[in-house]
């Protein structure tokens, strides 16, 4: 990796331990699929980046440029399956996600950012976790374990009052990699910590476990708190009327 400069531009972002072997062998995701009518979404082209040149230059590590690349990656591969116009775009995104995560890791490895800079340190951990989640969605070996590791480090580094929101995001990650029991536990902790928004993903995770009554309880509580979010009403209607199925979706090996 190209040496990182000592000047760092502002960095903006925003279960029990599962080892890499388990993540690598378990290429399935448990999904609760709601049979709701939805419009077909076509992927927009993924931009072309030279990640290293965009992020590293004489002034140091360009956090704004890194954020822009990560946002474009999230637009296309923030959920599984990824959305790309063609395989070439997908391959470039895979390379970009790995490269950008490596550059962020370099900030820690070279001690350019340390725990003595708590906000920047947490920002870097969060960026690596998110990029590794994206890389996992792109079927990069080892990415899920790396995301898990950095979410755990991030939670430990956060003040107690800030952990509920991050538990919600981490719970979403756990659900996405098929760790449904761990996801429910993490999302429950998020709700108990005051994150009412976590009730929606918690309801969906409970539905994945076949716990319809508990799922509806969380979905209804969410809908009451956030009546403007139409998703909750649609999910509740689908669950109540049996327009959903729980299935295992195989992630293709590459």
Where are these regions (language model features)?
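N-terminal signal peptide c-region/cleavage motif recognized by signal peptidases
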Residues: 38-40
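N-terminal leader/linker segments that initiate helical-solenoid repeat arrays
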Residues: 42-107
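Amphipathic alpha-helical repeat scaffolds of TPR domains
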Residues: 61-86, 117-138, 164-165, 169
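Structural signature of alpha-solenoid helical repeat junctions
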Residues: 96, 119-124, 143, 162, ...
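Flexible helix-coil transition and linker loops at the boundaries of alpha-helical arrays
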Residues: 103-122, 153-163
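Alpha-helical adaptor scaffolds
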Residues: 126-201
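Register position in tetratricopeptide repeats
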Residues: 134, 176, 208, 241-245
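Terminal, low-structured helical/coil segments at or just beyond the last alpha-helical repeat
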Residues: 217-254
């Amino acid at each position: 990796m190209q040496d990182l400069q000592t000047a760092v531009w502002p960095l903006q972002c925003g279960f029990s331990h599962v080892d890499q072997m388990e993540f690598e062998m378990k290429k399935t995701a448990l999904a609760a699929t709601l049979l709701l009518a939805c419009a077909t979404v076509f992927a927009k082209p993924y931009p072309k980046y030279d990640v290293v040149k965009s992020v590293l230059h004489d002034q140091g590590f360009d956090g704004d440029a890194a954020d822009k690349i990560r946002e474009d990656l999230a637009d296309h591969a923030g959920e599984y399956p990824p959305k790309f116009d063609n395989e070439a775009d997908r391959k470039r995104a895979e390379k970009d996600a790995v490269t950008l995560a490596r550059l962020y890791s370099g900030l820690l490895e070279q001690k350019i950012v340390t725990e003595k800079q708590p906000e920047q340190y947490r920002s870097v951990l969060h960026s690596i976790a998110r990029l590794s989640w994206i890389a996992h969605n792109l079927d990069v070996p080892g990415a899920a374990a790396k995301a898990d590791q950095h979410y755990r480090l991030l939670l430990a580094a956060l003040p107690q009052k800030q952990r509920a929101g991050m538990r919600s995001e981490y719970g979403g990650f756990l659900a996405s990699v098929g760790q449904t029991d761990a996801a429910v536990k993490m999302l429950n902790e998020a709700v108990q910590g005051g994150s009412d928004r976590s009730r929606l993903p918690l309801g969906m995770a409970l539905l994945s476990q076949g716990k319809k009554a508990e799922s509806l309880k969380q979905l209804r509580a969410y809908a009451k708190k956030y009546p403007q979010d139409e998703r909750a009403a649609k999910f509740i209607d689908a669950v109540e009327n049996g327009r959903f199925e729980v299935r295992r979706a195989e992630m293709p090996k590459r």
